[in-house]
C-alpha cells in the first residue's frame, strides 16, 4: 500500500516581540515593542493544517482594485446588451436549427416566423415566408433563343428585384456576355459591355445563370449537404445550413454561385415581401446563393421573372416531360446545345439559334 502524499507549504513565522524595558531596568510583559526583529524562523506546515489568519494577508493594491473594477464595468457593458437584445435570442434559435430536410412542419413554422421577425427588425418590412414543394411529374427546363437576345439586360434587372438580391455589394444571378461571332466559348465574352447601345454589329449575347444540372458538381463538393437537387429539377440551397466554405462556387463551371461577403443592402421599398425559404428570401451574410428558376413562382404555375421581362421573347420555360409544352416543341424542332457539354454536368438550361 502506497503512503499518502502530504504536500507542505513554506510559511514565515511572525517576529517574536521583545519585552519593553523601563528606565528602572524592569521588564513589562504586558507591553511589547517591535523596534527590533530577530532572525525569522521558517517551518514546514501541511496545507491541510494551514490556518493562517486571513486578516494578516496583504490586501489588493489600490491600482489593482481600480483596474479590476474598470474591467468588470467594461465586461458588463458588453454582455448585458447582448443578453437583453432580441437579436441574441434570434441567433440562438438559428444556431440550433435543423437541416431543412429534417425539420417537421412545426419546426418549419417556428423557423419561418423567426425569419419574418428578423426581416422586420433588419429592414423594417413585413414579409411572408412560404415553402412551395417540388412538383411531381415535372422537370423544369429553360431554353434561350440566342438569335433574339439583344443584350438589354432587362432579365438581369427583373431577377434582382424579384429575388431580393443585394444592391451593395451588387449580386446578380444572371450575367449577360457579349460574344464575338464565330465562338461559343464564354471565356471570350465581355461581361462589362455598354448596355445602352445594343445589339452591337457582329456581336451576339449569351445570358448565363445556374444550369440546374442533373449531375451537379456543386452538390457533390458541399461538406454539409446544404445544397441538393429536388424532384422537379431545381437545385436548392438551405441558406441557414450553408457554412460559406465556397467549395460549390469553385466547383461550378458556369460561375453561377455567388457569395454574400456583407449583409445584403436592399432599399426597404424594393423588397419583395412574397418570399420562399429555399428561394428568394433575403440571404444572410456569409452564405452562397444562386438562381433557382424562381421556384416561388414556377411551382405556383407562374413564369420566371426574367422570362416575363424579356422584350424580345428569347426565353422559353416549361416542363420537358409534357409533350405539349413549348419546351418539348423546341426540342423537337430546333438544334439545341448546352455550354461546356464535355464536363458531363447534364444541364437543364439550353440554347439554340434560329
Regions found by a protein language model. Give the residues of each.
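Extended, non-catalytic scaffold segments that flank or surround catalytic motifs
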Residues: 10, 47, 61-63, 94-113, ...
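C-terminal segment of N-terminal export signals and the immediately downstream linker at the start
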Residues: 23-24, 61-62, 81-139, 342-344, ...
